[in-house]
Amino acid sequence: MPSHQTPAPGSREQRTPTDAATPARGAPRLEAVDVTLGYDGSPIISGLSAEIPDGSFTVIIGPNACGKSTLLRGLSRLLAPEAGRVVLDGKAITSMPAKDVARRLGLLPQSALAPDGITVADLVGRGRFAHQRLLRQWSSADERAVRDALDATGTLPLAARRVDELSGGQRQRVWVAMVLAQQTDLLLLDEPTTFLDIAHQVELMELFAHLNRSGRTIVAVLHDLNHAARYADHIIAMRDGRILASGTPSEVVTSSRVEEIYGLPNVVIEDPVTGGPLVVPRGVPFSREVRGADATGVPA
């Protein structure tokens, strides 16, 4: 059984809505201040500010093309703001050397691709790049960091396997191990459960919750609203490049707010396992119109 095995949801050790309402936190290490972010001169987000509470499990939710991943790319330094700034540990993140950022912040991007034929151990070892120096190459500390990351994700038995031989769930855990090998306190995850079956989704979410309880700040973009409500203690809800709400799951995941964000009629009930909010869709009428597209079918 992987070493990250966590208490059953709803047990005393598991986070509850009450726990989430009053987390012990310091000043935010990571925040966006009045940022404008976009691509090729076309802004997706304009004048947005957001704080990531230190020690939190923050989840960013919202419909497709609302700016969730764009915000995460800005927070990770992959996308430079056209205006405003992203601040990491009191400094503008774009002014910091890439290796310095990588020693403080780890990122799991969407649809990461491994080099052909690379083994699990070699891929996870790439997480140590930020710790290499001209006069300090691979060391026993690097070896320990890789082994600990493999062990934490339950992928140590796969170390000698080629990544392209693994299942989708195994491959995603290997990518998480690579990020853990960076040994950062901040982890940014862009849709980490996409394309996984429900069992692998829950397994990964339990791993992230375990890492959060172990002291890491987690920031994840998720499509599954009920995963967000169950595992996060801080939710940022977006629509059309704006933040509509932020706060605890009980504050953000309400029936009226969910309909405002997604246009989805719904009922929010008590999760029978955690006691937190659980969204039950009422359904929406079928339409031949493609959401988010213009009359020609081209995405808006």
PLM region descriptions:
Residues 76:
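Helix-to-loop junction immediately C-terminal to a conserved catalytic motif
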Residues 187-191:
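Catalytic Walker B motif of ABC-type/P-loop ATPase nucleotide-binding domains
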Residues 125, 140-158:
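Conserved ABC ATPase "signature" region
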Residues 137, 162-166:
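Conserved ABC ATPase signature
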Residues 84-92, 101:
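Conserved ABC transporter NBD signature motif
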Residues 259-300:
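ABC ATPase nucleotide-binding domains
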